Amino acid sequence: MKRFLIIIIGGIAYGMALLFCGNIFELSDSQMKLLYICSAIAIFIITLTINLVYNFIYARKINKLIPLLEEEKYDDYIDKMTAIRNKVKSKYIRDTVQLNLTPALMGKKEYIAAVKILEELESDVRKVPLSDMVRRLNLCFCHFYLKNYDKAEALYINSKELFDRYKNIEIYHKNFVLLDLFMDICCRGKKEGLAERIKEARTKFTDKNLVGDFDYLDSLLEEKD
């Protein structure tokens, strides 16, 4: 409602400014039309530039917090992310912050809280393929840890086309290797060669935050023996 009122007031002020200029400079109808077009284009460009700069500044602030996540300082990470979320006006940035909160919640094993956020974001991030991929990927992992295997499998199948766009990109490849291991153990009923695949992945991907995932996969495999 507040934004709607601002738009109305801004539109009225813009119209009055154009009329004022037209009266002061005694502009003809064609000159007024040209003034309207040029000023509208200028306002659009200025607004777009301000929005891009605003989003860029906060995107950098978010990226600077990633080391806290890698160091498993989850509470500190969540506090700082939440402070950004509560401060920003941009809905896009707020959604990005919400999405970036979920890995920390997952690191703290608060999977139900992470699922709630990820499901609430569905309609908001659907039009941004990368954000939607990350949302779906994290949601798959949450379902696996909550042992909601039917939901995890259904989401995986529904997301396969989107996942295939990103699975071979270096920064995401390890996550999809992990996801396929979960699928093979929990949904596809595979056992043969999985211990070796987990060991190979553990050797290849040495990120500290993946150790717990590999340990959990080993424990799932042991349960099947």
Where are these regions (language model features)?
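N-terminal topogenic membrane-targeting module
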Residues: 31, 47-112, 117-121
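Extracytoplasmic/periplasmic C-terminal soluble domains
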Residues: 166-225
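Structural motif corresponding to the intra-repeat A-B loop/turn of tetratricopeptide repeats
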Residues: 71, 108, 146, 184-189
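Alpha-helical repeat scaffolds
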Residues: 77-84, 111-123, 148-163, 189-204
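Residue signature of alpha-solenoid helical repeat architecture, marking inter-repeat boundaries
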Residues: 55, 91-94, 129-132, 169-174
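"A position-specific structural signal for the A-helix of alpha-solenoid helical repeats
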Residues: 59, 63, 99-100, 134-145, ...
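N-terminal alpha-helical membrane-insertion module
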Residues: 1-66
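Non-cytosolic head/periplasmic domains of membrane-anchored proteins
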Residues: 130-172
